[in-house]
Amino acid sequence: MGKEAGAAESSTVVLAVNGKRYEAAGVAPSTSLLEFLRTQTPVRGPKLGCGEGGCGACVVLVSKYDPATDEVTEFSASSCLTLLHSVDRCSVTTSEGIGNTRDGYHPVQQRLSGFHASQCGFCTPGMCMSIFSALVKADNKSDRPDPPAGFSKITTSEAEKAVSGNLCRCTGYRPIVDTCKSFASDVDLEDLGLNCFWKKGEEPAEVSRLPGYNSGAVCTFPEFLKSEIKSTMKQVNDVPIAASGDGWYHPKSIEELHRLFDSSWFDDSSVKIVASNTGSGVYKDQDLYDKYIDIKGIPELSVINKNDKAIELGSVVSISKAIEVLSDGNLVFRKIADHLNKVASPFVRNTATIGGNIMMAQRLPFESDVATVLLAAGSTVTVQVASKRLCFTLEEFLEQPPCDSRTLLLSIFIPEWGSDYVTFETFRAAPRPFGNAVSYVNSAFLARTSGSLLIEDICLAFGAYGVDHAIRAKKVEDFLKGKSLSSFVILEAIKLLKDTVSPSEGTTHHEYRVSLAVSFLFSFLSSLANSSSAPSNIDTPNGSYTHETGSNVDSPERHIKVDSNDLPIRSRQEMVFSDEYKPVGKPIKKVGAEIQASGEAVYVDDIPAPKDCLYGAFIYSTHPHAHVRSINFKSSLASQKVITVITAKDIPSGGENIGSSFLMQGEALFADPIAEFAGQNIGVVIAETQRYANMAAKQAVVEYSTENLQPPILTIEDAIQRNSYIQIPPFLAPKPVGDYNKGMAEADHKILSAEVKLESQYYFYMETQAALAIPDEDNCITIYSSTQMPELTQNLIARCLGIPFHNVRVISRRVGGGFGGKAMKATHTACACALAAFKLRRPVRMYLDRKTDMIMAGGRHPMKAKYSVGFKSDGKITALHLDLGINAGISPDVSPLMPRAIIGALKKYNWGTLEFDTKVCKTNVSSKSAMRAPGDVQGSFIAEAIIEHVASALALDTNTVRRKNLHDFESLEVFYGESAGEASTYSLVSMFDKLALSPEYQHRAAMIEQFNSSNKWKKRGISCVPATYEVNLRPTPGKVSIMNDGSIAVEVGGIEIGQGLWTKVKQMTAFGLGQLCPDGGECLLDKVRVIQADTLSLIQGGMTAGSTTSETSCETVRQSCVALVEKLNPIKESLEAKSNTVEWSALIAQASMASVNLSAQPYWTPDPSFKSYLNYGAGTSEVEVDILTGATTILRSDLVYDCGQSLNPAVDLGQIEGCFVQGIGFFTNEDYKTNSDGLVIHDGTWTYKIPTVDNIPKEFNVEMFNSAPDKKRVLSSKASGEPPLVLATSVHCAMREAIRAARKEFSVSTSPAKSAVTFQMDVPATMPVVKELCGLDVVERYLENVSAASAGPNTAKA
């Protein structure tokens, strides 16, 4: 191999990062671009959110220069999957590179800020780069006309999809979409939502008011790197490949590659062959590889040939490039391109290769869409094995035994089918319509017909349904060939298909997947049958079907319909602004939004690593109840990186094995000696880097024993059977209302022992659990923690280490999303990190990988409710009894609070009388904890399930039953006591009536009925639900300090987790000190800085939870300002005697000279008579359900929420929209599944699907209702962080209405004794659940009826 025998030299990677040159020599070949950026450069914008290419937090722009053409190619990429060596001689641009504090912000960053599109901010740099990349891509299209000044060439449709691969858990996406669309030249600016650039309805929406955009303003490829590349090319031409000292090889020909294969060091287990490395996002590396061979530089693998017979794509052509080539082709090619646009996300498609996808499908049970659609198109592949080149059909290639790593896929040929009498269609069913989600089933069908629509040839390909690879349904193909389509023929084809498509044992949703395959085939064949000019009696499913046929066939236009998923996203916001307390009440933009967008905002993992820093990763139990006998490691490269393992034995004398604690008993930090649930921490691996620690933890081998142990308790049913409960303290127990037996005696009708279930939900904060511990002198330690509860974190660390609280300093600046998951659950990571640092006397950092975080998180409480309800014939309910089982997990955590929250939310209706039996079950699963609207969202759902059951039993309109059982103020006081407040503040009834009783609602309901009567395969539903949510006020500290120059520093007990706490506090500070300023304080806004929480600086900080932290922090700041105004007023009056106006700076300078204490630090406690109050809202949602797939599109949601007098309408709007969309996830697609041992198996972005931009309502309207002033509340404001989440119940209820319409149509019933319209739908209502309720066999039964009707009038089935 030329120089192979010589001494190996370490290659140097040269790249530009934001225009600056970097060299990396001797870097491990497994190092990702993200790791390099975050550890070897000042860049912190790209974040590690998942490590799978599934979240977009790490997106960067990569630019490559071709000296032969003098052209630069730019594309977005997922830096967590991109290997550093693969971007040698490339330029990388991050969010800091397009704009920052010093150089000025880019219009993308300014508009994200101005449209209120950043909350916690952790996802914002990735969003920023996805938008920027989309603009660059559009503006580089020379075939498009130049846009008007300030706009891009991007279209609104493209803009909406620009962030389709990016996840955000905070905003609900609507403001992000508006930001994207603001750049589109075809946008109507008046349609964009609330922003800081113009006042809607008062000022014209003009592009001149937006931060000016100029394409090409950012240089993405510096000239110095171009010169280096040109110079290097002259030097290295024809130089043979050399041995690599750092293990990275990049052959330039197939011959060079085979010489590497023949090397003595080549070994399948330690050498990884890569083109883009995106496959590691699906199949994670279990060990470190010490050698990589990059085949992307082999020219033969990058060929693109088009002729009149086929398109040939080299195996390392990116999926994005393949889409570009195929889009400019015939029907089949364009359809393939359309389907590939739904594979992964833009930033993954840009680097993922077409051949890599096919090779994964060949070697592994990978649910490839690429293989399926290419299989149906009759593709062939060329492979090289040793010196032989072989050609196979794709079907033959997939069916071969898995290829070894020496088998090289060269290219893929897709034949030209022409367009005469050819029909090609592809299908996929996935939780996200735009992609970024693996499909339950995918399929592609190609048919060639004669002029009379006789099927001459047909190919039916199915994939992702639970077998090793895509297959062709050949028996069905053979049956259909030569036949004309009829209902009978299609039915027989489906019967054959069901024998062919058989998921392997262990496949989830087995029957659903078969039903999907049937639905897809039916959709294709019925459409084909109806494409004839001859009439057909088969109802074709709605959707877009395009056929290109000969001229003697009627135009296909009659078959094209607009898919609901393609509707543009629209919105409307209504709110009232008040100047009463200005600048409080103004919709100012979020503090720090620009630095969040630029990536300069510092989160825990962004803090530069201290000298000698070590890194930790958890080893967790995979058994639910077992003795832990030992921890060892496999012999591997990763295990060689282990420095030590920290366990319970390392807890100092006097310390406690404690990881969290709340209210009652705590939870152990380590399983010792028994692991009590799968996912429990057993030990912490310590290594030199986070990647080494994470990889070493995977290599841990734990020896377990179940000797003398009882079987684990995993479910509510297990716990009840074995009397395993957590006791509820009497002071936390909810109280019943009235005499249940008397209420039941008054009822005309009764429903007894009906049951409904709700599963768990994962927080999916974008920043996983993180901590950095730095040991200090005299047994002191400082911990930077991503926590909602610094005070508790401090206390627990001190107890764990056995040192005084004052030795522990916990600092938390900002948190990248919390939702309750950074409260009790954050303390485990902080305690483990602190213990390791304390033991080793070196700084230790932990940043959990997404899988570990998901396995250990616990999440929302699963529960089961059994209810008995009595009611009158008019729908008035007289009595309700509820048996409630709550799965708490292994420790109490917040679980004792759950019954009160659940019953509190349930009480939104007047049940007449109410009694309940609640059991908080102790089980061998990870402790469940507080998650946004804990208990309330479940209680509200249970209430709606009961109301809908009653309405169904009486055949009454559901809203009529809801309205009849809403409280009047008298009954509200009976159910809620003092929390009901004043009658003037009870706004629920008026909000509900505004939505449910409006003429518009009645019109929409009538239109839905009309739609359902004329559409067999898609049904719509609409529902309006009320919400009542009780919140509690807690004591909180605050401190306002005025510096000598007049700038102001503020400390509060609350933590900025994205909820806009700092923004509201800043406004309140300006308002509170405004009496000292001529303009009422607005001049002070820019002088206020809210600083990070520090447990040794501000004690008794409490927790950031329960939705009221912002208002209580604001109130304590206001009181601080009152104290400061009292001190400063005499000086102000003295100065005013000499001058009419007093400048702020002069006032403070004089006060400082007079030695006035310019700091105030009160501790606010709520009035004993007003510790809680009620929040109200109502929400209407309209959905469309695809009966054939179970997919749901939310067509419109209208929310009316009572914010009182909002402290900041922009912030509160963001909270309302964001938590509503989080609720949509809970009720629809978020399936937090565990295995039979209770171990979470939906543990990453591939299997756990939070909402993306394609899941939000197509029309999303919010009205912020201003209820009567209430001086007991903080400036008459109300909470917004959690209550609106329960309004997402409206989506679930609307889905039920749509499903009910389908069940009526197809006479679907769960049992012969039950009506088709009465059924329970548990949470989450995923696609398989919806499809099953609509009927898994509706297609077969429909075709049987049609066939029977065709055969004769007396043979049709009912």
From Swiss-Prot:
Function in brief: In higher plants aldehyde oxidases (AO) appear to be homo- and heterodimeric assemblies of AO subunits with probably different physiological functions. Involved in the biosynthesis of auxin from (indol-3-yl)acetaldehyde. Can also use indole-3-aldehyde and benzaldehyde as substrate.
Broad class of where this protein is predominantly found: cytoplasm
SMART domains tied to this protein: Ald_Xan_dh_C, CO_deh_flav_C
Domain FAD-binding PCMH-type: 241-419
Obligatory cofactor(s): [2Fe-2S] cluster; FAD; Mo-molybdopterin
Record's catalysed reaction(s): indole-3-acetaldehyde + O2 + H2O = (indol-3-yl)acetate + H2O2 + H(+)
Species: Zea mays (Maize)
EC number(s) from the headed UniProt entry: 1.2.3.7
GO terms of biological process kind: abscisic acid biosynthetic process; auxin biosynthetic process
Coiled-coil parts of chain: none
Region annotation Disordered: where it falls in the sequence: 532-559
PANTHER family documented for this protein: INDOLE-3-ACETALDEHYDE OXIDASE, XANTHINE DEHYDROGENASE
pH-related activity note: Optimum pH is 7-8.
Compositionally biased tracts (Polar residues): 537-554
Activity regulation, per record: Inhibited by 2-mercaptoethanol, p-chloromercuribenzoate, and iodoacetate.
Protein name as annotated: Indole-3-acetaldehyde oxidase
Free-text remark on how the cofactor is bound: Binds 2 [2Fe-2S] clusters. Binds 1 Mo-molybdopterin (Mo-MPT) cofactor per subunit.
One family name in Pfam for this protein: MoCoBD_2
Classification via InterPro entries: 2Fe-2S-bd, 2Fe-2S-bd_dom_sf, 2Fe-2S_ferredoxin-like_sf, 2Fe-2S_ferredoxin-type, 2Fe2S_fd_BS, Ald_Oxase/Xan_DH_a/b, Ald_Oxase/Xan_DH_a/b_sf, Ald_Oxase/xanthine_DH-like
Record domain 2Fe-2S ferredoxin-type: where: 11-98
Localization annotation: Cytoplasm
Binding site for [2Fe-2S] cluster: C50, C55, C58
